[in-house]
Amino acid sequence: MNLMVQSEVRDSNCEGCKLAQQATGLDRCVTAEGPDKPHLLIVGKLPLSERQREELNNYLREVDIDPDTTAYTAVNKCRTWDIVAGKKEQKACSPYLDREIELMKPEWILALGNEALSATVGRSGIMKYRGREFDHTSGAKVVPTISPSMVVRNPGQRAGFVADLAYVKRLSSGEDIAEKLRLKNVTAVTTKERLRALIDHLKTAQGIAFDIETNGFDEFRDDAKIVSLSITTWMADDDHPTATWVVPLAHPQSPWRPQWEKVVRVLNKPMSQVPVRVAHNGKFDCRWLRQFGNRVSLTADTMLTAHMLDENRPKGLKPLAQTLLGVGAWDISTKDLMSDPLKQVLKYNAYDTFYTAHVYFVFERQLAEKPHLKKLLDKMSVPASEAFTDIEREGIWVDREAMDTNAHISKMELKTIDDELMTYVPDKKEWPEDIKEVNFNPSKFSRWFLFDYLELPVLERGKEKPNGDLGDPSMAEANMQKLQRDHPHRVIDLLLARTKWQKYSSAFFSAYQEQIDHNDRIHTTFKLTGTVTGRLSSGKGDADKVTGRVQNRGVNLQQVPRDKFVRGIFGAPPGHVFIECDYSQVELRVAAFLAREETMLNLYRTGQDIHTNMAMRMTNKPASEVTKDERKKAKAVNFGFLYGMGARKFVDTAWSNYGVVVTEEEAMAFRKAFFDEFPMLHRWHNKQRALARKYKRVESPIGRARNLPDIDSPHQTVRAEAERQSINSPVQSFASDMAVMALVLLNQEFKDRGLETHSVGTVHDAINFQAPIDELEEVIPLIKHTMENVPMEEWFGVHLDVPIVADVATGERWGGAEELDNDMVTDPVRLREWLAKQHYAV
């Protein structure tokens, strides 16, 4: 405790907020600890325990900051254990913090987390402002970063946190960044002579890092403009950039404004001919450049590389530069680049490519030690980015009339459900006084209606309330499904149906109606770095490159329900056919391969049905007597226990995913039957957990890593999740990577053959296509063969000795595609006859 500050600041009788009212003794109004006049003052959210202070000290020592010369204080001054500090508490404590800073006169302040950022510089958004330098009213310099608690919750943030501390150390000690990390030799291309000089320079360059600034997110908007373009170059044998060129384009102060699109086109060939072409999240830049006539492609993407090397870490350019290079954040505060001074825009743009180039060189050195990851990037991730650039620009066709019709039906279904629900609602005089209106969404009314009026049991509650009252009864869909199963009631049926139709109406059809363009297409964004497991995601929204605001682009195809009512609005336009090619039971097949589970491998090698086989085991019946429902239950067993699910969870999963009612006793018996039938899976599970504990990571057969620092977590639930991921990540990532590689191969094959057929995206383990009718006979067998024969052995030395099967379905619509017999796909005569019957023949 700093006695000088304590005597001047501490008010042991403070009752200014609920924290102070509960805190007692030394836990009330805790003031700064450390030297009277510290060079560096650290400000956190709450007073630290001894353990927390020692953990922070260890971080400081790691970057050569002496904890004994550093002071620490908190935004909220009282230490309590069951009350959450909010804005009111922060406001009540702010005079104490201000007085501490006034007395201690630190030269530097390190603000840990959002609360400290707000209290010291009045801003919000720690991920946006971390690593930047601000002026405090006292004259001190403030540098914000994340709190150590965020590192505990997400170990992937550790490297960035330590890098921020090292940056503060360097700033506060007067050290400067390395000479090669200084942005210099920048040329603003504002004349024809300089444009010619840039073109000549590109002819001799070995590599470029490029980046654009835009006036928005959607390149198809009528007013879409590229504000500026930056290109950083290097020559052969260089390990650092040599020059940066910034080209003002559509900015109001740009000399090229009247002809900026022509400048973009002029740079197409010079940029495309440079051997090495790098960008960060380059799919965005390539999409925009293609919209305006520049088809430059990537040979490397630093965001894709960052994800491949460590999927847990932040993948934004700024945190990567801070972590890998030790530089501070650079940013532009404007919300509209078109209204910001041109000089500021160009400087920001130049920093982007300058540091992209530096990050690229760091990654190249790291990849030299991990050639298997380099091959994954070269064979899959980077060419997939190229393929998805075109896929995103093309979009997926939507039957506008069907969409509008189904949107109307959804609203009518909701009204019908609400009308019936109202018949169960009692007269208003029976309602509690604090409830004023009917609300069938999760609300005070619906909870009273279900759990008090109808007296249905409460299965789960939310967090305990600050006053000690029980949390609200949960109306989560999973809990409602359990109620439906165990305590049937018409109201529960109606509420679950209401949830479905409400989701259809608002999350799907209303969103689609807003997003569909004049060509009846919806454009989405596919994210190759969207999940830590390696699976793709789509439509989650991209951050605007300037403001950081997240905007939705298209639909999340992974979440479109299998219900034909929704999927049926997607398809192919007249003269074309929608093709879906889906890997059959690919996770079971891959798991059998990884576990060397001979029973499973033999079933697949001999073409037997693994679900029927499991049903036979569960029922002691011959295959001929296994019913459809018994096979369905066996399917739930196979997929449910594949990754080691417990019996209790299986009861809920079987019901929610398959509509199968299973008792806990049955689930235990089914689990035993599963591992008795496939014993090597159990051994493989144990092996994966052991590998994760030993190496803190696991790998797929082709070397994609899943880093699992949480495997050592003291929290059982966190540790259990890491163990679960040690089992399912290698399987799911391998299956997803195989689909992406197949898409890359097919994308190139279609181009080489001059075909119009193209992919419209992936959904988990399936690839969807749009094909002209006259190309079906050629592309259907091509798609199936390519997906089943990805050259894993040639590229990665992996001999996949389990048959991989891709099922092909075709139709006018996604939801109504008809599956083709596998033998027919490979028989030209039968395929031609079938196409003719479907009126697909030309």
Regions found by a protein language model. Give the residues of each.
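Acidic, low-complexity intrinsically disordered tails
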Residues: 1-6, 175-197, 238, 812-842
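Conserved "right-hand" nucleotidyltransferase catalytic core of DNA-directed polymerases
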Residues: 170-251, 273, 294-297, 312, ...
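Short hydrophobic beta-strand that contains or immediately precedes a catalytic carboxylate
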Residues: 42-44, 145, 208-210, 279, ...
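A common structural junction motif
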Residues: 785-796
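Acidic beta-strand-to-loop metal/phosphate-binding motif
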Residues: 105-113, 209, 275-282, 578-580
